[in-house]
């Protein structure tokens, strides 16, 4: 669907969450991270092919059990991982196998990227941006959660 909408220049955006039984509004990437990766793979492929995308991104979750800010940080990290994995897909060989109709080899290119640990890349990017390497630990250590709990009492 994503590739089709991109091709038709009709892709407006995404509201990311995850689901098991219905529109559960669960943490992005918590149930099916491969699906999230495949979405980002199509977006990266389109940009790689020179398309200019104007896509709106939104996280649409209902934080009922987990702490809201922490769950949002988990979602953002899952999105970052999916995007980083999409960036390392070997586009040259993927295209070759697709054109040859070699579905098994094309799928292996995708699964190899998906199964790669991209956290070192993400840590490096965070370091270069001057943001915490571990956002949840940083949030917990900051005292902010306790501060807002007290303010709401």
What are these regions (language model features)?
Residues 1-153:
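Histidine-acidic metal/acid-base catalytic patches
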């Amino acid at each position: 669907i994503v590739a089709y909408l991109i091709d038709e220049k009709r892709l407006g955006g995404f509201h990311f969450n995850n689901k098991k039984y219905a529109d559960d509004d669960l943490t992005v990437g918590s149930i099916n991270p491969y699906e999230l990766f495949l979405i980002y793979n199509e977006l990266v492929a389109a940009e790689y092919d020179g398309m200019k995308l104007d896509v709106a991104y939104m996280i649409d979750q209902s934080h009922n059990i987990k702490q809201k800010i922490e769950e949002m940080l988990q979602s953002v990290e899952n999105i970052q991982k999916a995007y980083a994995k999409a960036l390392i897909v070997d586009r040259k060989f993927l295209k070759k196998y697709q054109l040859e109709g070699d579905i098994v080899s094309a799928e292996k290119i995708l699964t190899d990227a998906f199964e790669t640990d991209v956290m070192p890349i993400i840590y490096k990017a965070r370091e270069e941006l001057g943001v915490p390497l571990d956002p949840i630990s940083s949030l917990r250590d900051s005292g902010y959660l306790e501060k807002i709990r007290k303010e709401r009492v």
